[in-house]
């Protein structure tokens, strides 16, 4: 046990009032706490992946079975690629890119950054394919572009998502940004990532409702199988978003800082507060 650990143990024992059971309680905390949190975390991550993957599968079944399948020919089958690509890209891959910092918390920071940026790039490419598909379909069918709230929200989300990816690339993967700039932009980057996930899910819900009203407006109130399946998709998307936000915002699931990151934090505090870094 290190000197710092012994000091921490002594402090906790003193807070316990020196009772005989205090050391036993402390030992139980050390032995069972991390394992219990780890198993809960693994279960929550697994549940999030099930929700996300099932959402993609439901979207594929909806568009493939009930809406005629997929093609790239300007027909309604090309439109069917739009919801599939958007759920896969802006929801599932986007959420997983955010989650890698929690799942791989003990891996080298540079590797996690590369994985984070790569998954986001795949999400961006997939989403662009989905947007091109719907624009092609509208052009071929002589349908006006960007007239609905769903289209406004979707295009705004995609543009901001693209900007977020470029800013992250410039600040965190390229070596040009200073430590002060990175530390300043990091909270904004994290907040924008979660906000964009919420926007993507909200826009998806608008799109689901819009598609149902266009396709089965007369039979939708009769609880048709297609309508029920699409409603379940919406519920799963919401649950996926809630679970992702929970995992990302819980303090105990945050990535523990390594010595290099702690040194950077001390350096940033010195720059902003004018104090001298404490010696170890």
Locate predicted features.
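Membrane-proximal N-terminal segments immediately preceding the first transmembrane helix
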Residues: 2-3, 12-37, 56-72, 94-102, ...
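Non-transmembrane, juxtamembrane loop and terminal tail segments
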Residues: 2-33, 256-280
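Juxtamembrane membrane-interface segments at transmembrane-helix boundaries in membrane proteins
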Residues: 29-42, 68-85, 113, 140-153, ...
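Membrane-helix exit/interface motif
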Residues: 62-68, 95-106, 129-144, 167-177
